[in-house]
């Protein structure tokens, strides 16, 4: 068992994956406290070479999908194989502060669980502020996750995710928005006003497909 499972799904983003994993090497929480489950969702690409570089420094499990399943199905596969008390998703083209895992897990240690079940501070998930960075890693702008939601970088208690039912695989985009909406119907999500996550903006971001985004935004509104 681990305190944290870090879930990373990679599809045609190998060029960014080294930076993502490197940001997890020197976390201020011991490496024995967290595992990384990396899903390769591109059958035509191999990630073993990347994993081998970090295998002495990180507890990585690589799962190769036999066919492209899409992000929500891959995230659910990670959750089904998780051994962590907490779960956090990091996108393969993003990276995090060295204090990211410690700060978010410590907050949940102090503010979730049956011992404070009647407290207004009882949270089953915590997000943090983030920086947008360009494809070279240069800072562009700071954002509040509370005001400008992103689906990655949120740490959940595993039990609460089991309760709400993981990701809806019908949502090939906006899967995080759909899941967090269901999650907030039952549980609190707190936002730490600390920019611990780096959200990379580049030419192949999934959200660049505005027609797809708008289509699933309409689906979200229709499914209310």
Residue ranges of predicted features:
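Acidic donor-binding loop at a coil-to-helix junction in glycosyltransferase catalytic cores
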Residues: 172-179
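Conserved donor NDP-sugar-binding/catalytic core segment of glycosyltransferases
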Residues: 99-139
């Amino acid at each position: 068992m681990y305190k944290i499972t870090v879930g990373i799904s990679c599809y045609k983003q190998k060029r960014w994956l080294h930076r993502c994993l490197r940001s997890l090497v020197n976390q201020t929480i011991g490496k024995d406290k967290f595992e990384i489950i990396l899903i390769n969702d591109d059958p035509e690409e191999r990630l073993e070479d990347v994993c081998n570089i970090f295998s002495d420094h990180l507890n990585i499990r690589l799962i190769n999908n036999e066919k492209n399943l899409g992000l929500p199905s891959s995230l659910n596969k990670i959750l089904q194989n998780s051994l962590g008390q907490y779960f956090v998703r990091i996108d393969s083209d993003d990276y995090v502060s060295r204090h990211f895992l410690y700060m978010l897990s410590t907050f949940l240690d102090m503010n979730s669980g049956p011992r404070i079940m009647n407290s207004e501070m009882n949270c089953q998930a915590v997000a943090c502020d983030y920086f947008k960075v360009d494809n070279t890693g240069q800072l562009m702008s700071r954002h509040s996750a509370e005001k400008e939601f992103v689906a990655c970088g949120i740490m959940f208690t595993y039990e609460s995710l089991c309760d709400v039912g993981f990701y809806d695989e019908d949502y090939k985009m906006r899967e995080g928005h759909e899941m967090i909406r269901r999650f907030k119907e039952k549980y609190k999500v707190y936002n730490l006003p600390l920019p611990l996550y780096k959200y990379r903006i580049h030419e192949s971001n999934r959200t660049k497909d505005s027609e797809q985004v708008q289509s699933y935004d309409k689906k979200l509104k229709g499914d209310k």
